[in-house]
Amino acid sequence: MTATSGARTSDARTSGARTSDAGIGSPAAIELVGVAKDYQTRGRAVPAVSRVDLAIRPGEFFSLLGPSGCGKSTTLRMIAGFEEPTRGRILLQGRDVTAVPPNRRDVNLVFQSYALFPHLDVAGNVAFGLRRRGVKGRELRERVGAMLDLVELSELADRRPRELSGGQQQRVALARALVNRPAALLLDEPLGALDLKLRQTMQIQLKAIQREVGITFLYVTHDQGEALTMSDRIAVMNGGRVEQLASPRDIYERPRTRFVAGFIGTSNLLRRTVRALDAAGPGGRPTVVLDAGTDERLSAPLHPPTGPLRAGDQVELTVRPEKIEMSVSRPDGPGCALRGRIVEVVYLGTYTTYTVATHGGTEITVFWQNSTGAGNVAERGDEIWLSWLPEHSYVLPEPVALPEPVALPGSVVPPETVNQPDSVGPPDSIIPPHSVVAPDSVDPRETVVPAAGTSADPAAYRISH
């Protein structure tokens, strides 16, 4: 489903801190200043989003990533104008649009449900918004043709939606949202209904299209692979807050919090006690040395925002499974080394997963690339050594209780669940004019909204003045 509601940037760091790096004289495409959203339930305020400060650069592919209930879709709907912030301001291209209705915001929104008009062919669906704006004749044909070329659907211009695959329908919805040249495009899990192979293909195509048109894309997803594949930057959300904002590589390689380390990819978390601090560790970087067994070694460089540490402090060391090597003898050198016994072996094609129980009682996962096809390097029950470079591990402060995902009490559906696969899309009254609308004769000054309980069929839509 496409909808209408724009702006240009900055940077937000851990826990919602805000900095601006859009460049002198260049406003953020989308900027949130202290934005919060509470829902009133049984006479009390339930926070769904808690003070988000965020700035998205012009032409950036930016993702909001997090589990269901973290507030990412609620944040997106506030930007689109479908939800009103309880506190804070929303700016699009430097203009405060907090109180501006969705149809007055220069952004378009693509939902997981594409809501293509079944009585119109592909070209008609793409042209619909242009016709609503009074574009006619040669300009209409050229703009529709260019957009169909962009999404590689020119040869299917005369087909109806029912004659298209899921991926083709998704591209029609994308073309319909882009043809009006919005300042920014908001996408709420648009690939969620596609199968795995098609979803992976569409990720590459979507990023290529974004790069070609140069429009700011704000993408909401719970899928780490989607965010890592397509994004220039990612904001990881949890409990209504931004836990970390960084590039995909930094999010994966240098998580700032225990939640990010556990949510992004697979991480091994080892709780240990600080034995000593080395001000000049490997590479001259400050290093923390942790307690380990006889002949074992554990250390990691210190990164902000770890904070000051002292001997005896409890910390967690995190290391990714693919960074770990296995050997039958104790490895030489200054790297990390632990002994263990293999308790599980799972063959997954491109790699094999080994679960290793260390002598300290912690289970560690190892991903071993199957590059030679020679079979397993070790078997269940084998005693082995695990090793990795200290710079491949990361020290996190002692874990604290993590906030639970926000869910409204009682039978109320949490805001985040609205556009999941078994959902019906946004509430009835929030579809802006030149997105999901009725036949071409409708006056462009009129707002078209679906009648309660109806499908995406334009015949079921009514006019609201």
Curated annotation (Swiss-Prot):
Residues 30-264 form the ABC transporter domain. ATP binds at residues 66-73. The keyword Nucleotide-binding applies. It is an enzyme of class 7 (translocase). Gene3D superfamilies: 2.40.50.100, P-loop containing nucleotide triphosphate hydrolases. It catalyses: ATP + H2O + polyamine-[polyamine-binding protein]Side 1 = ADP + phosphate + polyamineSide 2 + [polyamine-binding protein]Side 1. InterPro entries: AAA+_ATPase (IPR003593), ABC_SmlMolc_Importer (IPR050093), ABC_transporter-like_ATP-bd (IPR003439), ABC_transporter-like_CS (IPR017871), Mo/tungstate-bd_C_term_dom (IPR008995), P-loop_NTPase (IPR027417), PotA-like (IPR005893), PotA_ATP-bd (IPR017879). The keyword ATP-binding applies. Residues 1-21 are annotated as: Disordered. It is found in: Cell membrane. Residues 1-18 have a biased composition (Polar residues). NCBIfam families: potA. Belongs to the ABC transporter superfamily. Spermidine/putrescine importer (TC 3.A.1.11.1) family. The complex is composed of two ATP-binding proteins (PotA), two transmembrane proteins (PotB and PotC) and a solute-binding protein (PotD). Part of the ABC transporter complex PotABCD involved in spermidine/putrescine import. Responsible for energy coupling to the transport system. This is Spermidine/putrescine import ATP-binding protein PotA. The lineage of its organism: Bacteria, Bacillati, Actinomycetota, Actinomycetes, Frankiales. The gene is potA.
